[in-house]
Design a protein with these regions (language model features):
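RNA substrate-binding interface of SAM-dependent RNA methyltransferases
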Residues: 1-99, 163-171
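Conserved acidic residues
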Residues: 30, 92, 121-122, 141
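Secondary-structure boundary/capping motif
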Residues: 41-44, 105, 132, 153-154
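Short, glycine/charged-enriched secondary-structure capping and boundary segments
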Residues: 47-49, 108-112, 138-141, 159
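Short, exposed beta-strand "edge-strand" segments with a Pro/Gly-rich flavor and a Y/T-containing core
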Residues: 69-75, 100-105, 150-156
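Long, charge-patterned amphipathic alpha-helical coiled-coil/hairpin "stalk" segments used as oligomerization
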Residues: 95-136, 146
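Structured adenosyl-cofactor binding patch, chiefly the S-adenosyl-L-methionine
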Residues: 130-172
Length: 172
């Protein structure tokens, strides 16, 4: 969404791809899905990933390649859910994140749920711009409490939020 709560798309950035992939690999995430409906944006993201997986970057930095190998570019949330289900063998628990102050599950609650025997895989939905469209958020099974600092400023980049959330849910 944009600042006027209109549904829009935002551009994929190289930094978001790299940093989210690296944080995900660090915290043992088995897959990262970048969802974007615009073909040119998916092509852009794929070119970045392919550079590190198959081109010059493959030999140049094997650790970055390792992180980017788990990233998939898909057109829709349905595509991401279907692929995650295929990989894990069961539908993932969809976790909506938002910077807006709302009552949501605590990180301790979600972590316990994720670590419970027989727990389904978890898919954390992160948005850019001014948040996710309502139709995406409504599909989530659970709302996670926002990442909050000590002050009133709360507008993290998606890659910063991803790193913090992963540390709270998967960190030692």
């Amino acid at each position: 969404m944009n600042r006027n709560a209109e549904v829009v798309t935002s551009a994929i950035t190289s930094l978001d791809i790299h940093d989210i992939a690296r944080a995900s690999r660090t915290y043992g995430v088995r897959g990262v899905f970048i969802v974007h409906p615009i073909p040119e944006q998916r092509k852009f993201a794929a070119s970045i990933i392919d550079h590190w997986r198959f081109d010059f970057g493959r030999a140049h930095d094997s650790r970055r390649r390792e992180a980017l190998e788990q990233v998939q570019i898909v057109e829709s949330l349905d595509d991401a859910i279907a692929e995650a289900t295929r990989i894990a063998g069961s539908r993932p628990l969809l976790v909506h994140t938002s910077a807006r102050t709302a009552t949501g599950a605590s990180y301790a609650e979600l972590r316990a749920r994720m670590e419970a025997p027989g727990a389904p895989p978890t898919m954390i939905l992160l948005g850019t711009g001014f948040g996710m469209a309502a139709e995406i958020a409504e599909r989530a099974d659970i709302l996670l409490a926002p990442v909050l600092g000590p002050g009133d400023y709360n507008h993290l980049s998606v890659r910063s939020a991803a790193g913090i959330i992963l540390d709270r849910l998967r960190g030692k």
